[in-house]
């Protein structure tokens, strides 16, 4: 059964304050999102398995630990998820990066995939799906669906800010997926924005509307 983790680390909360602030410019916003993604990746990878190897220091031979051959994949949901990728790759530079693009069907209002590019060895990888916002949960649910349809067995979802409605939607559709959140906000408003949230993450990351 998947769990929900909300990070209360002081550095994450400090940086989130400036991410939320409407007066934060594009450059600083982009840097802060990347930094928080790095801090969250540190926590998410805490359970990676280790194995012992023998090395030689300048002083003597020694036994030490390395990550036990895990294959990791980072999957940003386009377009805002791209802003979190480099922060994760700073800690896990060998991870493969895929992409999932979704658009909202004008009639059903449900997300539909228009672009999926994944590593070839999907079944062998542990995936982290990233998107700054988890609002209604529709995009996250569909992105995880896209991975599972292609054989993914191990999936985590990571976002900066979530609404309770989005968390419940992902838990209901994918009860096996762990959800990692920097902040759990109050609710969604009538327009589907998280309150208090941070506005449109994609617009603020790329300086476009």
Curated annotation (Swiss-Prot):
Provide the cofactor list for this protein. Answer: Mg(2+)
The answer, when asked if Nucleotide-binding is one of the entry's keywords, is yes
Instruction: Write out the catalysed reaction.
Output: UMP + diphosphate = 5-phospho-alpha-D-ribose 1-diphosphate + uracil
Q: Which GO MF terms does the UniProt record name?
A: GTP binding; magnesium ion binding; uracil phosphoribosyltransferase activity
**Per the annotation, how and in what number is the cofactor bound?**
Binds 1 Mg(2+) ion per subunit. The magnesium is bound as Mg-PRPP.
Superkingdom of the source species = Bacteria
Q: In which pathway does it act?
A: Pyrimidine metabolism; UMP biosynthesis via salvage pathway; UMP from uracil: step 1/1
NCBIfam families for this protein? PRK00129.1, upp
Query: What functional role does this protein have?
Result: Catalyzes the conversion of uracil and 5-phospho-alpha-D-ribose 1-diphosphate (PRPP) to UMP and diphosphate.
The name under which this protein is listed is Uracil phosphoribosyltransferase
Q: Tell me the lineage of the source organism.
A: Bacteria, Bacillati, Bacillota, Bacilli, Bacillales
């Amino acid at each position: 059964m998947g769990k929900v983790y909300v990070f209360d680390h002081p550095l994450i909360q400090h940086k989130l304050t400036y991410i939320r602030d409407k007066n934060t410019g594009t450059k600083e916003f982009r840097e802060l999102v990347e930094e928080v993604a790095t801090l969250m990746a540190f926590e998410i990878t805490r359970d990676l398995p280790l194995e012992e190897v023998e090395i030689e220091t300048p002083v003597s031979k020694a036994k030490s630990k390395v990550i036990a051959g895990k294959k990791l994949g980072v999957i940003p949901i386009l377009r805002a998820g791209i802003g979190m990728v480099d922060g994760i790759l700073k800690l896990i530079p060998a991870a493969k990066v895929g992409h999932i693009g979704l658009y909202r069907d004008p009639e059903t209002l449900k997300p539909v995939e228009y672009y999926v590019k994944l590593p070839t060895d999907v079944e062998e990888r542990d995936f982290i799906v990233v998107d700054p916002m988890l609002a209604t949960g529709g995009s996250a649910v569909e992105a995880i669906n896209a991975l599972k349809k292609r054989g993914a067995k191990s999936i985590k979802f990571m976002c900066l800010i979530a609404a309770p409605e989005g968390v419940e939607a992902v838990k209901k559709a994918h009860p096996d997926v762990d959800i990692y959140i920097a902040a759990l906000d109050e609710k969604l408003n009538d327009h589907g924005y998280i309150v208090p949230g941070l506005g449109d993450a994609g617009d603020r990351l790329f300086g476009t509307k």
